[in-house]
Amino acid sequence: MRTNYCGLISEQYLDQTVTVKGWVHRRRDHGGVIFIDLRDREGIVQVVIDPDTPEAFAAADSARNEYVLSITGRVRNRPEGTTNDKMISGKIEILAKEIEVLNAAATPPFQIDDENISENVRLTNRVIDLRRPVMQRNLRLRYQVAMGVRRYLDAQGFIDIETPMLTRSTPEGARDYLVPSRVHPGEFFALPQSPQLFKQLLMVAGFDRYYQITKCFRDEDLRADRQPEFTQIDLETSFLNEDEIMDITEGMAKQVFKDALGVDLGDFPRMPYSEAMFYYGSDKPDMRINLKFTELTDLMKTEEFKVFRGAADMKGGRVVALRVPNGAKFSRKEIDEYTKFVGIYGAKGLAYIKVNDVGNLSNGEDSGLQSPIVKFLSENALKEIIARTGAQNGDIIFFGADKTKVVNEAIGALRIKVGLEHGKDNGYFTDEWKPLWVVDFPMFEYDEEADRYVAVHHPFTAPKEGHEDLMVSDPANCLARAYDMVLNGWEIGGGSIRIHRADVQEKVFAALKISPEEQQEKFGFLLDNLKFGAPPHGGLAFGLDRLVTLMTGAESIRDVIAFPKTQRAQCLLTNAPNSVDDKQLRELSLRLRQKAAETKEA
């Protein structure tokens, strides 16, 4: 029987006989003495096998990397000069008495300690990849976070309740994953994008405080921080307002970071959505980067420079500046790369001014400002730009001029890129945890393609008090009782106070151009139950995958999920999704269209 984990044997076990079981991480033959580094989930221990124990020596001699061994031996100090203070087991070794080969292993597709492996190779051989210490650490931390969440919410009186995985499709927002019903031919279940409606119904049912760590599914285009199936920390409360809900969930985040990382997150400042977009161009600003937008739209309405004037006069246009301290040293090549970068977000170019001498702000050839655009701007505008941005000698000022959405996304992304690349060396990046709440979101945003307003969060979010009439009269300025928790530029949680009155919910549906008939067909079960004395309620959902990605510093969300999908929504380990035979399709009353069938065969 195993007595100890490999990585947990320390000096306290000196002269004791122990039995460890694990995988051969490395095997070395040093002049007739064999050394084996044996690995299990807790780490590595060094085992010494000498010829005085011939059976153990023969077993060790036959072992290769990834063989599974059971080793019994005596714990002793390592020789002087061979210790490793970074490991719990770094000062001891095991002198083997007995070795049993529990299983041989084929040569693995890569070495466990190889750090230069392509992601495709790793995902195809995910089981071997999961043996790597970094992956073991990531998934252990994920477990610690999940358990910390459970402990905290249990102590706060929350009840863990499961909600259905097979539910009805409500095609609003992202596409649903559909599951055909064999019993009801031609009808489909949908996998839940979130437990939203069920958790609201649990509040109507009187459970008061609910939580669940659950899988959710969205059939959407994938990015580095997205998966078709993801894990959500979901919670809902009755009779609490947004301040009280934010206090509870902020406390949870602080406790989890303290327990898992030993980190004190400190205060969570609150920032209105309008301020976040005005200064940072993002509703999830990275506050580690001390760079802000400077508004120039009003100034450019009287300038002749067409690029800036056109954006300033455009309906929904915006002109901003982004001052970067010590940025005048950026090379032409670097600026060209930044220009190409903002093009990803729809920007047609990237104007800039290098500030060489703030004492000479003319627009002539001897100007202290260096840029192709200086001659097109009035001296008054140049002075105002320098005054508003607070630019000093040696700085560079970048400009965004276009539709507000393009400017916010392009210059917002540039702010992050420049901040991460140059901020630490130039004093405008702080490498620490910077949490905040973003509040007072718009209730609606206009969808030009659909030619109607859509919900910014979801259609069950309550309007801010005093804004109910604006849903009809001025939907663009109607604010929601919504809040997002943001950490270092990532939205890790989002929530809102919900609508608990059926008449208000019907008004929101009407503002979204959802007819009474469609309301009843899609959401009749919600509207009907809201009429039976629904309490005021609200909640929040955290993305567990994103949270753990941040906490581990992993490059990809796929590094904190045991068996993730690729960016093409495939599992390379199991080759899912896969074809099914005609018999299965017939049982489901389905038939592939000819084009789809031909594509599969190809």
Curated annotation (Swiss-Prot):
Instruction: Give the first-level EC class, as a single word.
Output: ligase
Query: Which reaction is recorded as catalysed by this protein?
Result: tRNA(Asx) + L-aspartate + ATP = L-aspartyl-tRNA(Asx) + AMP + diphosphate
| Molecular-function annotations in GO | aspartate-tRNA ligase activity; aspartate-tRNA(Asn) ligase activity; ATP binding; nucleic acid binding
Q: Where in the cell is it found?
A: Cytoplasm
- Which GO annotations describe the biological process of this protein? aspartyl-tRNA aminoacylation
The entry describes its oligomerization and partners as: Homodimer.
Protein name, per record: Aspartate--tRNA(Asp/Asn) ligase
The gene for this chain is aspS
